[in-house]
C-alpha cells in the first residue's frame, strides 16, 4: 500500500469515527471545524488520486446523477407490519395471547420498548461492512431502490465501524425528519416561493423518493434502526435489546428512548412516560412498539399472516380527525396581530375535545382554499394549539361561505394593515385597542416575565374593561379598595394580588426586558441583551450597530428594539415602572473561559424560581455548555429546581454532580 493510500485510509477512518461520535453517540470529541478541515483534506487528495477513490468514502454521500425512476427490490426476508393495540385492555390481551402460546413460560416476560417513529421504514444492506443497497418497505415484499438517497443521510454510515464486519447485514429502521429540520425546510420553501410540506412525515417521504439525490442531501433526514433482517457471517446477540446495542457499537444509530421493561405493568409505565414527553422529543411519534426481548421466544411465537406474534404497536389516541368548520372569528394579539380562529364542530382529538383551531393568517386561508361549512382535517400534537392541516374540497356544501379577512380591527375599529414581507396583518390601534392592551398586560405579569402570581388574565380583563389600568405601571398603583370592588375579588384575594405586585418589584434585568413585550424579543434574546449591556440605560442608548453585536440579534430584531426606545410613550412607561419601585441587582456573568460549565453536558430538571427554563438553557449555552434533555453517564452536571423528579433520581444513581439553583447561580456570577 502506497503512502497516499495509507493517508487516505487513515483520513476515512478518522472521519467515520467523528461521524459516529456526532450522529450516533451525540458526543463529538472535536469541533465541527476539525471535521470540516479533514473532510476537505480527504476530498482534495481524492481529486488528485481518483484511482484510490472508494464508494464508502465520507466524501461520496452525494454525487449520483438524477434517476429517471426507481427500480424495484425484492426483500429476501419480508418487512412485516405490526398489529395494533389502542388501550391497556388490548395490550394486556396481547400479553395473555403470548403467555397462552409459550410452552415454557418464563418467570417474567421482558419487553424491549421503543417509541413508534412516524416516518418511513427502510432496509439497508451492508456487504462486508460497506453500504451496498437500500430500499423502502413498499408492500413488505417488494420495495423501491433508494440507495443513492440513503447514502446522503448524515447519520447513516457508508461503512460499518468494525474491523470484522458481517459478510451481509441488513439493517432495518425508520427514516424521519426532526421538527427543527422540518421547520427550517418549510421556512426556506416559503422564502423561495416553493411548495411547503404539511407535516414531517410527508417531508421525509417526499425527500426519500426524490429522483435527484442532490436534493435529498439538502433535506434534514435521520435514521433510527429498530431491527435486523439478513445476518450472515456473524453471531448475533440472543436478545433484541442487545442486538440494537450491537448495531450502535458498529456505527448504526438507534433511538435513545429504547428501554427494557419487565412485565406488563412496566411496559404500561413506559407507554405513559413516552406519551407525557411526546411533545418535547423533537420528532413525531404515534405510539410505542413493544417486543418480546428474548430472540428464542420470538422464534417460538412466530408470525400470523403479515405480523409477528411477539410484537405490537400500542398507538396513542388519534392526533388527526375530521370535523366541520362552523365559523371563523378574528382575534387581536399583544402586538396587534390579527389571527383567524376556526370555530369547529367539537371533535375528540388526542385525548381532548377540540372546538377551536388556529388558521394563522390570510395566506394560510388562501393556501388551504377553505370556506365556512367545509369538512376539515384537524391536528393536535402534544401541547401545540390545534390547527387545520387540510380540507376535503370534494365534500364542500353548496351553501359554503367564503372567509373574508377584515379591513378594520374587530375590537377597536382601527385600520388593519399588512407590512410588505410579513404574513401577519396587524391592527394599528396600539394601546388604544383594548385587546392589545389586555394581551400586553397579560404578557407583563406572566411567569416568564414579571411572574406576578395572583394577577391573572381574568383580573387583567376586568381592570382594562373598567378603564382602571392602561399601562403596566398602573398595576403597581392599584389599592385594596379598587380591587375589592371587582367581581370575585374578596379582601384575601386582593391582598394576595397586592403582595405579589410588591414582591414582583424586585426582578432581574432580563425578565424586565422580556416583560416589556418588544416585538421579536423572546426570553433568550432578553437574557442576551441583559448580559451584553448590563444596564437598562446602556440598552436604551444603543444604536443599531451596537445592538447587532448581541448574540442572536440580527437587523430585524435590532430595528425593533431601536424603534421601541425611540417612542416617547414606551420610555414614559418604563420610567413610570422605575418610579413605582421596580428594580433589579446588577449581575455580571462570568466569561465562558472561566466558568465551571464550559464544554460540559448539563441537564436541567424541576422548577427554577430565579429564571425560566429557556433562560437557564440560553445562559448555559452562552457559557459554553451543552444542555441535554436526558441524564446519562455522559452528563457532567444536573441542576435541580423544585419538584425535581426522575432525572434527579437517575443523576444520584449515577453519582453525577447535582447543583441547586442557588449553587448554579453562585457558580456563574461574580
UniProtKB/Swiss-Prot annotation:
Its EC number is 6.5.1.2. GO terms for molecular function: DNA binding; DNA ligase (NAD+) activity; metal ion binding. The lineage of its organism: Bacteria, Pseudomonadati, Pseudomonadota, Gammaproteobacteria, Pasteurellales. NAD(+) binds at residues 32-36, 81-82, 114, 137, 174, 291, 315. InterPro entries: BRCT_dom, BRCT_dom_sf, DisA/LigA_HHH, DNA_ligase, DNA_ligase_AS, DNA_ligase_CS, DNAligase_adenylation, DNAligase_N. The gene is ligA. Pfam families: BRCT (PF00533), DNA_ligase_aden (PF01653), DNA_ligase_OB (PF03120), DNA_ligase_ZBD (PF03119), HHH_2 (PF12826), HHH_5 (PF14520), Nlig-Ia (PF22745). It catalyses: NAD(+) + (deoxyribonucleotide)n-3'-hydroxyl + 5'-phospho-(deoxyribonucleotide)m = (deoxyribonucleotide)n+m + AMP + beta-nicotinamide D-nucleotide. The active site is at residue 116. Its cofactor is Mg(2+); Mn(2+). SUPFAM superfamilies: BRCT domain, DNA ligase/mRNA capping enzyme, catalytic domain, Nucleic acid-binding proteins, RuvA domain 2-like. CDD domains: BRCT_DNA_ligase_like, LIGANc. Belongs to the NAD-dependent DNA ligase family. LigA subfamily. Residues 592-670 form the BRCT domain. This is DNA ligase. GO terms for biological process: DNA repair; DNA replication. SMART domains: BRCT, HhH1, LIGANc. GO terms for cellular component: cytosol. Zn(2+) binds at residues 409, 412, 427, 433. DNA ligase that catalyzes the formation of phosphodiester linkages between 5'-phosphoryl and 3'-hydroxyl groups in double-stranded DNA using NAD as a coenzyme and as the energy source for the reaction. It is essential for DNA replication and repair of damaged DNA. Keywords: DNA damage, DNA repair, DNA replication, Ligase, Magnesium, Manganese, Metal-binding, NAD, Zinc.
Amino acid at each position: 500500500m502506497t503512502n497516499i493510500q495509507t493517508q487516505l485510509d487513515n483520513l476515512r477512518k478518522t472521519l467515520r469515527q467523528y461521524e459516529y461520535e456526532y450522529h450516533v453517540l451525540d458526543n463529538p470529541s472535536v469541533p465541527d471545524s476539525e471535521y470540516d478541515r479533514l473532510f476537505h483534506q480527504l476530498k482534495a487528495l481524492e481529486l488528485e488520486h481518483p484511482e484510490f477513490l472508494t464508494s464508502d468514502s465520507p466524501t461520496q454521500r452525494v454525487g449520483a446523477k438524477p434517476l429517471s425512476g426507481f427500480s424495484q427490490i425484492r426483500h429476501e426476508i419480508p418487512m412485516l407490519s405490526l398489529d395494533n393495540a389502542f388501550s391497556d385492555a388490548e395490550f394486556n390481551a396481547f400479553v395473555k395471547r403470548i403467555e397462552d402460546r409459550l410452552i415454557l413460560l418464563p418467570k417474567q416476560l421482558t419487553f424491549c420498548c421503543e417509541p413508534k417513529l412516524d416516518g418511513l421504514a427502510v432496509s439497508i444492506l451492508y456487504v462486508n461492512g460497506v453500504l451496498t443497497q437500500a430500499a423502502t418497505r413498499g408492500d413488505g415484499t417488494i420495495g423501491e431502490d433508494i440507495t443513492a438517497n440513503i447514502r446522503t443521510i448524515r447519520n447513516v454510515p457508508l461503512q460499518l465501524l468494525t474491523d470484522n464486519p458481517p459478510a451481509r447485514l441488513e439493517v432495518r429502521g425508520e427514516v424521519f425528519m426532526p421538527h427543527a429540520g422540518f421547520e427550517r425546510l418549510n421556512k426556506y420553501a416559503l422564502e423561495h416561493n416553493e411548495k411547503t410540506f404539511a407535516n414531517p412525515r410527508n417531508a421525509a417521504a417526499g425527500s426519500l423518493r426524490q429522483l435527484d439525490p442532490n436534493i435529498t442531501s439538502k433535506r434534514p433526514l435521520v435514521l433510527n434502526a429498530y431491527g435486523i433482517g439478513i445476518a450472515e457471517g456473524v453471531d448475533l446477540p440472543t436478545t433484541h435489546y442487545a442486538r440494537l446495542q450491537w448495531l450502535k457499537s458498529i456505527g448504526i444509530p438507534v433511538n435513545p428512548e429504547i428501554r427494557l421493561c419487565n412485565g406488563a405493568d412496566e411496559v404500561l409505565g413506559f407507554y405513559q412516560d413516552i406519551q407525557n414527553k411526546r411533545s418535547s422529543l423533537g420528532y413525531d411519534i404515534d405510539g410505542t412498539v413493544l417486543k418480546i426481548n428474548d430472540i428464542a421466544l420470538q422464534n417460538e411465537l412466530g408470525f400470523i399472516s403479515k405480523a409477528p406474534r411477539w410484537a405490537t404497536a400500542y398507538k396513542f389516541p388519534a392526533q388527526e380527525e375530521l370535523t366541520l368548520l362552523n365559523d371563523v372569528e378574528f382575534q387581536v394579539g399583544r402586538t396587534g396581530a390579527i389571527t383567524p380562529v376556526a370555530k369547529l364542530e367539537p371533535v375528540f382529538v388526542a385525548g381532548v375535545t377540540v372546538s377551536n383551531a388556529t388558521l394563522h393568517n390570510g395566506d394560510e386561508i388562501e393556501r388551504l382554499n377553505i370556506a365556512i361549512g367545509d369538512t376539515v382535517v384537524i391536528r393536535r400534537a402534544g401541547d401545540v394549539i390545534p390547527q387545520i392541516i387540510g380540507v376535503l374540497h370534494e365534500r364542500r356544501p353548496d351553501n359554503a361561505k367564503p372567509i373574508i379577512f377584515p379591513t378594520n380591527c374587530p375590537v377597536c375599529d382601527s385600520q388593519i394593515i399588512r407590512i410588505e414581507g410579513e404574513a401577519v396583518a396587524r391592527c394599528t390601534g396600539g394601546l388604544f385597542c383594548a385587546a392589545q392592551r389586555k394581551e400586553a398586560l397579560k404578557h407583563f405579569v406572566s411567569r416568564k416575565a414579571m411572574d406576578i402570581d395572583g394577577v391573572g388574565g381574568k383580573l387583567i380583563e376586568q381592570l382594562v374593561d373598567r378603564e382602571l389600568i392602561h399601562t403596566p405601571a398602573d398595576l403597581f398603583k392599584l389599592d385594596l379598595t379598587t380591587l375589592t370592588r371587582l367581581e370575585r375579588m374578596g379582601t384575601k384575594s386582593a391582598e394576595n394580588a397586592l403582595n405579589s405586585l410588591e414582591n414582583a418589584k424586585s426582578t432581574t434585568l432580563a425578565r424586565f426586558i422580556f416583560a416589556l413585550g418588544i416585538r421579536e424579543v423572546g426570553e433568550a434574546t432578553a437574557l442576551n441583551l441583559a448580559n451584553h449591556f448590563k444596564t437598562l440605560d446602556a440598552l436604551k442608548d444603543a444604536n443599531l450597530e451596537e445592538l447587532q453585536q448581541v448574540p442572536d440579534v440580527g437587523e430585524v430584531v435590532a430595528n425593533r428594539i431601536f424603534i421601541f426606545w425611540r417612542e416617547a410613550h414606551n420610555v414614559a412607561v418604563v420610567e413610570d415602572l422605575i418610579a413605582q419601585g421596580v428594580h433589579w441587582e446588577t449581575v455580571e456573568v462570568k466569561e465562558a473561559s472561566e466558568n465551571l460549565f464550559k464544554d460540559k453536558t448539563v441537564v436541567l430538571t424541576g422548577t427554577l424560581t430565579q429564571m425560566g427554563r429557556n433562560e437557564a438553557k440560553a445562559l448555559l449555552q452562552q457559557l459554553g455548555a451543552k444542555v441535554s434533555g436526558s441524564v446519562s453517564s455522559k452528563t457532567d452536571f444536573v441542576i435541580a429546581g423544585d419538584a425535581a423528579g426522575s432525572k434527579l433520581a437517575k443523576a444520584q444513581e449515577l453519582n453525577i454532580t447535582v447543583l441547586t439553583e442557588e449553587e448554579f447561580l453562585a457558580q456563574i456570577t461574580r
